[in-house]
Structures are given as C-alpha cells and as structure tokens.
Amino acid sequence: MFKDFNFSIYLVTDDAFFVDRDVVRTIEQAIEGGITAVQYRFKNKPSRKMYEELLVLRDITKQNKVALIVNDRVDLAIAVKADGVHVGQEDLPPDVCKKIIPEDMIVGYSVNNLEQLKDAMTMPIDYIGFGSVFHTKTKKDYKYVGLEALCKATNITSIPIIAIGGITHYNLKDVLKCKVKGVAVVSAILGFEDVKRAASDFKQMYKESLSMQI
C-alpha cells in the first residue's frame, strides 16, 4: 500500500546522468543524503544488467527503508521483489499490471494533464506522477502544466499525487503548497557531482518549506 512508503523525496534515474557514473553507488549516495524513494528508470540498458543492478539496489533500499520502484518493466519489478512499478501512458495499462504483480506491490501512473487525470481516477493505481509541472530537459517532449493545474489535481482526487518535472530548490516551496504527497526529482540531485550533498541539501529545503506552511 502507498501509505506504507514515504515518497516525499522521490529520485528518478535518467540515462543521461549515468554516462560516467556507477548506478548502484550513485543511488546509494543519494539514499545516504536523504532521498525516501527511488524509481529505477533506464531506457538504453540490457535487461541482464538492469536485473543485476536492481538485485543489489533491492538490498540497499530495504536496509534503508527506501521504496524501490521500477519504471515500465513489470517483469524486473517482480523478479527482484521491488516495492512497485511505475507505468506511463504508452506502457502496460495499470489494470493489467495489477493482475500480474503480487498484492503487496504498488502501481504508479504518469499523468500529463487534467484530462488524463480524470481517466486515471477510474484506474486501480496507488499514486499518480503529475507533470511536467515546469519545463525540464529530461522530458523535452512534455508540455509543462504549471502550478495551477497541479493544485487543481490535488483538489479533485484522493489518489496521492507526486509532482514531477523541473522541480528544484527554487520552486519547491510553491510546489508543496499544492499539498502533494511528494516530489520526483532528477537533475536537482543527479545534476550535481556530489550526489549525497545535493540530496541532503534538497531534504533540508523540503523540511524548511513544509515548516513554513504550518
């Protein structure tokens, strides 16, 4: 169940940030810095390599009580006993995923606008990744929806929403005002050489932003 996990700082991996980096060590450093969940997302990597990396990451994430979500690859998620799978508009439908995965695994679903959100509200999903909220280099083909749409999204559904797309230290406070359950980040952490420090700084900013809203 989604409530069993903390998705407040949800790291999403991207091929572009791992050209000269070790995947496992980099994610481990981000965990040491304070991320609470990680989505393993690679589009240009052999399945065997992904499986081997995920096996190691499964142990690390379990030890640190960090949720491990696998993007798109339901087979790999099942094979390594991940906490869940995340699918998009062109991937395997959520209802099909639910029929395949164990009952204790969750399904996340990407939604790019309010119309798609309305459709998603009828699906068997555990959380929604909504965005891109802002312009982002990692999703160049996505139109950004803005804060107004994000706030509307959290108001019209009880399904937990994770904000995604272009979220940085500079706009985090405004994003959290929309009452999201967490933020998905890529470059805000992976865009720095010292990933542990970047994650730690982002975590501190997250805490400060939340405290200002109380």
UniProtKB/Swiss-Prot annotation:
UniProt pathway annotation: Cofactor biosynthesis; thiamine diphosphate biosynthesis; thiamine phosphate from 4-amino-2-methyl-5-diphosphomethylpyrimidine and 4-methyl-5-(2-phosphoethyl)-thiazole: step 1/1
Binding residue positions for 4-amino-2-methyl-5-(diphosphooxymethyl)pyrimidine: 39-43, 71, 110, 139
Catalytic activity: 2-[(2R,5Z)-2-carboxy-4-methylthiazol-5(2H)-ylidene]ethyl phosphate + 4-amino-2-methyl-5-(diphosphooxymethyl)pyrimidine + 2 H(+) = thiamine phosphate + CO2 + diphosphate; 2-(2-carboxy-4-methylthiazol-5-yl)ethyl phosphate + 4-amino-2-methyl-5-(diphosphooxymethyl)pyrimidine + 2 H(+) = thiamine phosphate + CO2 + diphosphate; 4-methyl-5-(2-phosphooxyethyl)-thiazole + 4-amino-2-methyl-5-(diphosphooxymethyl)pyrimidine + H(+) = thiamine phosphate + diphosphate
Family statement drawn from the similarity comment of this UniProt entry: Belongs to the thiamine-phosphate synthase family.
GO terms of molecular function: magnesium ion binding; thiamine-phosphate diphosphorylase activity
Annotated source species: Hydrogenobaculum sp. (strain Y04AAS1)
Protein name per Swiss-Prot or TrEMBL: Thiamine-phosphate synthase
Pfam family, one: TMP-TENI
Function field: Condenses 4-methyl-5-(beta-hydroxyethyl)thiazole monophosphate (THZ-P) and 2-methyl-4-amino-5-hydroxymethyl pyrimidine pyrophosphate (HMP-PP) to form thiamine monophosphate (TMP).
